[in-house]
């Protein structure tokens, strides 16, 4: 069974706190992605990784960093959370292949920064 697991469904943090959002996939996928989903803006890519220790900035990397120490785990880090980072965060993974491999999404983490 295809599975992408995010650490929490709901998180509430204070402004200035450090936040870790964890994502694990059990399908041996090379590619992993972190998105945020906001009303009227759709899915926006924050960072992605195509292998261990590899990371690439997406469209909105400002205020975020990532870690990919193991193939199955991709962590999104907010060094100092701000209220404009209140959002739904979605992790996804896919195989690398000669065709467009489908993205498998986690259930999402709703982060509220107060």
Model-derived regions, located:
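Extracellular domains of the immunoglobulin superfamily
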Residues: 1-114
């Amino acid at each position: 069974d295809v599975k992408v697991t995010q650490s929490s469904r709901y998180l509430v943090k204070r402004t200035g706190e450090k936040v870790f959002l964890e994502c694990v996939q059990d399908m041996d996928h090379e590619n992993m992605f972190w998105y945020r989903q906001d009303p009227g803006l759709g899915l926006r890519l924050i960072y992605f990784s195509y292998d261990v220790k590899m990371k690439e900035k997406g469209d909105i990397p400002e205020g975020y960093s990532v870690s990919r120490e193991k193939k199955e785990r991709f962590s999104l880090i907010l060094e100092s959370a701000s209220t404009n980072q209140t959002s739904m965060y979605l992790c996804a993974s896919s195989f690398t292949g000669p065709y467009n491999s489908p993205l498998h999404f986690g259930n999402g983490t709703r982060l509220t920064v107060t």
